[in-house]
Amino acid sequence: GGTDKGAAGAGGRLLEKNLNLSMALKLRAALRKLGFQVIMTRGADSTLSLQGRAELCKKYKPDLFISIHCNAAAQKTISGIETFAMTPNGCASSNDSKPGNSTGTGNSFDKNNYRMAYEIQKALLKNTKAEDRGVKHARFFVLRNASCPAVLIETGFISNLRESALLNRADYQAKIVNAIVAGVLNYRASYR
């Protein structure tokens, strides 16, 4: 957000930062209706560094951390939803070109990270009928430095004309939000 516009679609008029914030605010409202306490890393169009996000996570000690994004690719036909969890201890990241170079420390939430990502991805596919790009592992800064189970959701490709049009629609954003809520509830139920 703020000065970091993220990816752009629709000839540069549609900005990832705006779509992400719109979905995040809707997600906050939906989770609060269910009694969840929700802390946002940004509630307006403001800039917050990755380090700042990690520090907020450490300060508030949430039960989970969800990062919402829109994907982009040079090839405009690529589409679909993917959800990332922290790479487990000793494993390579899904997005590494040289897997042997990236094995390293996971975190104490390995099992929880993947379970939450799986539940959210499953619900997203059911609600949106989007292409399944899978649950993947990565050592993204926000996942690596979260002090709780964490996922990063790529809600679709802003670079794909059809998907960017969907992502810009309130009804499609509601499908995404409802799916994330369902995934969180299913994740929580699996640990009770």
Predicted segments with their positions:
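Active-site histidine-acidic residue metal-binding/catalytic motifs
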Residues: G1-P62, T87, A92-N95
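Short, well-ordered secondary-structure micro-motifs
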Residues: A7-A8, Q51, K76-S79, S94-D96, ...
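Second-shell loop/turn segments in exported
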Residues: A8-K17, I39-T47, S102-K111, Q121, ...
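Active-site-adjacent mobile loop/cap segments within catalytic or ligand-binding domains
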Residues: L14, L64-Q75, N127-R192
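Extracytoplasmic/secreted envelope proteins and their assembly/folding machinery
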Residues: L21-A24, R28, Q51-A54, I81, ...
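Soluble periplasmic/extracytoplasmic beta-strand elements of cell-envelope proteins
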Residues: S22, Q37-T41, L64-H69, E82-A85, ...
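A structural motif
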Residues: K76-N101, Y114
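Active-site-adjacent substrate-binding region
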Residues: F109-K136
